[in-house]
């Protein structure tokens, strides 16, 4: 049984209880998260970068997302799972875009997430919500628009940009989103937005005042020693621990210490 549902997001904001979300892409990681206290899982299109080595999220496709959502849902059937709508999948005609939503939901997502709040997106979100499908918005640094934004950089610094982010957040809430991700926006702006809309905000690089926080599993475990944005706290030195385990394995194989005849052999 799933431990969390969409009304719980609203309740947790009302009760001032923080929401924890982890981005996860695979079965074995999801199995670990399923045994943790983390509230919910995002299967993000960032898998194009983290799992496949691309420089942007753009190569993620609906089918790739569906395969990873299936894997995560098998590993964490007790967690609320959000599936990212990948690049351009919701910028097509309504039938094609809804087919993409259907694919992700049938793969095991309980909600979808999409980036931006222009007129096209708001109309599409309205249709999806009216179809009974929960939607999370995403504002600030929206990686699918990376070439328009000019890189992975903080958004909303200028007054006009901050005003637009506030208006977009209100529009997403009014259109029916049950939460919104705020990525790489100034802390004060994120706090203002959080206090100005009824739905929860989930921050990543948006300060401590948001309704919750999301980090990519591999990032919080410290598995990439080359990746250290300002917002990231590594809760484990995963790179060094995993590397040491591999080196220990290598040494024991080469010294015939492993496998031990009495302990590891049949």
From Swiss-Prot:
GO terms for cellular component: cytoplasm. Binds 1 Mg(2+) ion per subunit. It catalyses: 3-methyl-2-oxobutanoate + (6R)-5,10-methylene-5,6,7,8-tetrahydrofolate + H2O = 2-dehydropantoate + (6S)-5,6,7,8-tetrahydrofolate. Pfam families: Pantoate_transf. It is found in: Cytoplasm. GO terms for molecular function: 3-methyl-2-oxobutanoate hydroxymethyltransferase activity; magnesium ion binding. Keywords: Cytoplasm, Magnesium, Metal-binding, Pantothenate biosynthesis, Transferase. Its EC number is 2.1.2.11. Homodecamer; pentamer of dimers. Belongs to the PanB family. Catalyzes the reversible reaction in which hydroxymethyl group from 5,10-methylenetetrahydrofolate is transferred onto alpha-ketoisovalerate to form ketopantoate. This is 3-methyl-2-oxobutanoate hydroxymethyltransferase. It comes from Coxiella burnetii (strain CbuK_Q154).
């Amino acid at each position: 049984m799933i431990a969390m549902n969409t009304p719980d997001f609203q309740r947790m904001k009302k009760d001032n209880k923080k929401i924890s979300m982890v981005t996860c892409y695979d079965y074995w990681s999801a199995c670990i998260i399923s045994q943790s206290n983390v509230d919910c899982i995002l299967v993000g299109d960032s898998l194009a970068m983290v799992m496949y080595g691309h420089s942007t999220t753009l190569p993620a496709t609906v089918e790739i997302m569906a395969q990873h959502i299936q894997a995560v849902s098998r590993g964490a059937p007790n967690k609320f799972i959000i599936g990212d709508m990948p690049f351009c999948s919701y910028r097509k005609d309504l039938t094609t875009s809804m087919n993409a939503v259907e694919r992700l939901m049938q793969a095991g997502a309980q909600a979808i997430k999409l980036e931006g709040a222009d007129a096209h997106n708001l109309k599409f979100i309205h249709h999806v919500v009216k179809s009974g499908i929960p939607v999370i918005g995403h504002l600030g640094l929206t990686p699918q628009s990376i070439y328009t934004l000019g890189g992975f950089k903080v958004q909303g610094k200028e007054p006009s940009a901050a005003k637009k982010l506030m208006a977009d957040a209100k529009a997403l809430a009014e259109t029916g989103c049950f939460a919104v991700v705020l990525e790489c926006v100034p802390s004060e702006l994120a706090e203002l937005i959080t206090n100005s809309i009824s739905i929860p905000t989930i921050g990543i690089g948006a300060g401590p005042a948001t309704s919750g926080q999301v980090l990519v599993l591999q990032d919080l475990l410290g598995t990439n020693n080359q990746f250290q944005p300002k917002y990231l706290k590594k809760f484990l030195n995963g790179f060094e621990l995993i590397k040491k385990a591999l080196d220990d394995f290598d040494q024991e194989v080469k010294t015939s210490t492993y496998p031990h005849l009495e302990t590891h052999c049949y």
